[in-house]
């Protein structure tokens, strides 16, 4: 197993143990019945957040993406980007980070942006990409500030076609972002990694979800984003 594969499998295992990645029967926002659910909101204490940040930082450095700073879209991205900046500094790569407010302030420092000045090549840090709305807003903010969106860094790529349970699109939200903005989307792990984890989990209860996850992949899935 390559070092990158080990990192991805380590993240899946960590997410399962933290209760962030769970198995059962879940209805997604698109109305699809999924055999797994990824809830990044459960990374809710200092130790878990610190570990997540390490995964983000290592994945970003290993990706080869050239970057000068990080941007965290409100709200989840704020914590994720700031924690990742701390982890990067611990790895010898100290960069600035910024985030946006949902509502601009008209007093104090004012405006909708907080943190380091947006400049150079900016990596957008978020948990997942669903409809791509957060990415679109982030790209606009970054470009309007005179900086360049360099990549999007996410926790999990579901590798799932857009649409709903009946109308299934040709591409995933991640692929749409890459095509529209011409920048890479880097994920710590994806659905293929989840299937690999279930193959070797050694837990009969988990192994039972492997066939369901594979069937879901066959129906709604797309090829992995490289």
From Swiss-Prot:
* Record flagged with keyword DNA-binding: no
Q: Which InterPro entries match?
A: OPRT, Or_phspho_trans_dom, PRibTrfase_dom, PRTase-like
A cellular-component GO term for this protein: cytoplasm
Q: What class of enzyme is it?
A: transferase
Instruction: Tell me which Pfam families the record gives.
Output: Pribosyltran (PF00156)
Q: Part of which pathway?
A: Pyrimidine metabolism; UMP biosynthesis via de novo pathway; UMP from orotate: step 1/2
- Required cofactors, per record? Mg(2+)
Q: Which organism is it from?
A: Ralstonia nicotianae (strain ATCC BAA-1114 / GMI1000)
Reaction equation(s) it catalyzes:
orotidine 5'-phosphate + diphosphate = orotate + 5-phospho-alpha-D-ribose 1-diphosphate
Entry superkingdom: Bacteria
Q: Name one GO biological process term.
A: 'de novo' pyrimidine nucleobase biosynthetic process
Q: Which gene encodes it?
A: pyrE
Q: Which residues bind orotate?
A: 37-38, 130, 158
Residues reported to bind 5-phospho-alpha-D-ribose 1-diphosphate? 29, 75-76, 101-102, 105, 107, 126-134
Q: Which UniProt keywords apply?
A: Glycosyltransferase, Magnesium, Pyrimidine biosynthesis, Transferase
Q: What does this protein do?
A: Catalyzes the transfer of a ribosyl phosphate group from 5-phosphoribose 1-diphosphate to orotate, leading to the formation of orotidine monophosphate (OMP).
State what protein this is by name.
Answer: Orotate phosphoribosyltransferase
EC numbers: 2.4.2.10
- Could you state a single Gene Ontology molecular function term? orotate phosphoribosyltransferase activity
Q: Which CDD domains match?
A: PRTases_typeI
What NCBIfam families does the entry give?
Answer: pyrE
Q: How does it assemble?
A: Homodimer.
Which stretch is the leader sequence? none
Family from the record: Belongs to the purine/pyrimidine phosphoribosyltransferase family. PyrE subfamily.
